């Protein structure tokens, strides 16, 4: 594109962004009138990031701020990251990285991660984000199925690739490693970058290996618009504005990291703030929030649950924008934070395959237990699983007659799965929800997690929410357990909070609490104290727990408590 065309693309993106900023607390107007900017050619790193970096208003504004556990820190302005990423892009090009090449990026929260994301985008390369927790077997899968031609990793992780065959460029960040290119050499490259041609808006940019809860990871393909432009919806949910300092607790390699540590905050011209720690410490985290003036905070339910175990009042200057993501938050957590900080955690819902679809947006009433309403740019429909017709409860789907920009291109390795996901004119999320007369959607569960007990439909999430209100319960997962009379009954796997013993007395207390707070047909009738199996990204693998129950059949498992063990429960 020429200069005039480049300027027009930037202007259209900015107009859409500014419309959402202007109507940040006017949901009705934003939802009714927002229109996605749609492009034929678009490169977010060049057409947006480099352009805002050149804006005099951002000359001294920090794009990235990383604080280490020992108190050391690094801060980089928008112009600095623009220049450094162009150097990295030129250097990667010299190492053979070409448009369309797939590049595994496996780094921690360090500046080189963001530089490489921007550099790869400028080059038109396809990024395969990878967690530093992955081992050789997972990495072989990514190299093979991902057809990776280049890898950029920490020097400390190079040994993992000794067991990963393949003809790929090896680049190490950190100490020099024999046989690997040193990333540090990139900073000697020219800072003036020119692309080798235009970037198609639908060209691939990201390839995510999802941490599926039921099967082998899927390859979710995103384009140069589906995440960069699509995350305007995430920016709207977070409520970010220029000048905000945003902390999102998420590990590199997973989609949520790109959501809230790259695209959404930089779309808003906000600062991405990171606090690196080896072990979570609620008091230390709150001290950093205070010291660094964090204005916006996003965390998964596990972190929120650990935070409420601490003295929340120790935080003198709470963030004014707080959200929860990953899995729906339980109402009792939201209430405790509201009482201590005077702000309401706003839930949202999205997937690796999408940007945020449903959310409690700024300035709007929050319905306890609800994920919120469809965000601007998304037309959400709940489809009955039997009739396929719109219903007040059903699978959460996106209407493709108004296809949102923030939706994947498809599954790169599976045309059949892609066709299934986009069947019938809808994108099918595989999640079940219910909707009220005001459009608020409440999460019910994955389509394969919801089950029937005595012919009643049971939502694991609803029962888990009640369990988590008990002081002895840190985490919980509910699955169906085979029963000769009811066919299945709800069984809870429980991780205890610190200071509580896995005893019959504790089990009776939890079961009694559930009887007092659940309708009779929803009662948890069996309970077992155990660690919860999780995916590498932290999602509970209920499918594994269901498998244990099916294997045991009606036989009582070791360490399992049943309601009939406690005759006093009926009193």
Predicted features, each with a name:
Residues 59-62, 178, 188-209, 215-216, ...:
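Conserved pre-ATP/AMP-binding loop-to-beta segment of ANL
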Residues 68-71, 156-201, 557-558:
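ANL superfamily adenylate-forming
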Residues 82-87, 201, 220-241, 249, ...:
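Conserved structural elements of the adenylate-forming
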Residues 134-135, 141-142, 153-154, 297, ...:
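AMP-binding/adenylate-forming catalytic core of the ANL superfamily
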Residues 228-245, 252-295, 310-311:
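Conserved AMP-binding/adenylation subdomain of ANL enzymes
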Residues 387-420, 458:
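Conserved ATP/PPi-binding loop(s) of AMP-dependent carboxylate-activating enzymes
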């Amino acid at each position: 594109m020429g200069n005039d065309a480049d300027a027009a693309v930037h202007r259209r993106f900015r107009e859409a962004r500014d419309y959402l900023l202007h109507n940040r607390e006017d949901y009705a107007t934003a939802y009714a009138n927002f229109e996605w900017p749609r492009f034929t050619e678009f490169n977010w790193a060049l057409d947006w990031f480099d352009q805002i970096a050149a804006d005099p208003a951002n000359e001294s504004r920090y794009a990235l701020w990383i604080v280490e556990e020992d108190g050391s820190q690094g801060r980089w302005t928008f112009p600095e990251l623009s220049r450094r990423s162009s150097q990295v892009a030129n250097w990667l090009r010299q190492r053979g990285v070409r448009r369309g090449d797939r590049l595994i990026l496996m780094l921690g929260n360090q500046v080189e991660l963001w530089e490489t994301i921007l550099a790869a985008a400028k080059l038109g390369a396809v990024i395969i984000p990878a967690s530093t927790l992955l081992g050789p077997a997972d990495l072989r899968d990514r190299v093979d199925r991902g057809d990776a031609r280049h890898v950029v990793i920490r020097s400390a992780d190079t040994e993992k690739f000794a067991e990963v065959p393949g003809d790929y460029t090896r680049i190490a960040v950190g100490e020099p490693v024999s046989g690997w290119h040193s990333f540090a050499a990139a900073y000697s490259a020219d800072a003036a970058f020119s692309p080798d041609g235009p970037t198609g808006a639908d060209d691939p940019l990201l390839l995510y290996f999802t941490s599926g809860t039921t099967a082998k990871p899927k390859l979710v393909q995103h384009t140069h618009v589906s995440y960069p432009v699509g995350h305007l919806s995430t920016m709207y949910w977070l409520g970010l504005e220029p000048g905000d300092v945003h902390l999102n607790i998420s590990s590199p390699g997973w989609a949520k990291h790109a959501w809230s540590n790259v695209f959404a905050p930089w779309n808003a011209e906000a600062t991405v703030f990171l606090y690196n720690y080896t072990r979570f410490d609620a008091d230390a985290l709150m001290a950093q929030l205070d010291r660094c003036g964090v204005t916006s905070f996003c965390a998964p339910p596990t972190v929120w649950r650990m935070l409420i175990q601490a003295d929340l009042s120790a935080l003198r200057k709470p963030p004014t924008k707080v959200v929860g993501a990953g899995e729906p938050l339980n109402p009792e957590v939201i209430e405790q934070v509201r009482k201590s900080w005077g702000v309401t955690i706003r839930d949202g819902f999205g997937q690796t395959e999408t940007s945020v679809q449903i959310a409690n947006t700024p300035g709007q009433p929050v319905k306890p237990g609800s994920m919120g309403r469809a965000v601007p740019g998304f037309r959400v429909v709940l489809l009955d699983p039997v009739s396929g017709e719109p219903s007040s409860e059903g699978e959460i789907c996106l209407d493709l007659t108004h296809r949102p920009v923030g939706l994947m291109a498809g599954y790169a390795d599976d045309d059949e799965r892609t066709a299934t996901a986009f069947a019938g004119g809808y994108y099918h999320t595989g999640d079940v929800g219910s909707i009220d007369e005001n459009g608020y959607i409440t999460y019910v569960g994955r389509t394969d997690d919801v089950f029937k007990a005595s012919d009643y439909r049971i939502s694991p999430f609803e029962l888990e929410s009640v369990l988590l209100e008990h002081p002895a319960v840190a985490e919980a997962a509910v699955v169906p357990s085979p029963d000769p009379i009811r066919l299945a009954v709800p069984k809870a796997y429980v991780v205890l909070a610190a200071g509580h013993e896995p005893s019959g007395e504790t089990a009776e207390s939890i079961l009694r609490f559930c009887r007092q707070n659940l309708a009779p047909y929803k009662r948890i009738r069996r309970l077992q104290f155990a660690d919860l199996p999780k995916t590498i990204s932290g999602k509970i693998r209920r499918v594994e727990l269901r498998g244990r129950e099916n294997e045991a059949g009606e036989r009582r498992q070791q360490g399992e408590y049943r309601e009939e063990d406690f005759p006093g429960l009926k009193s």
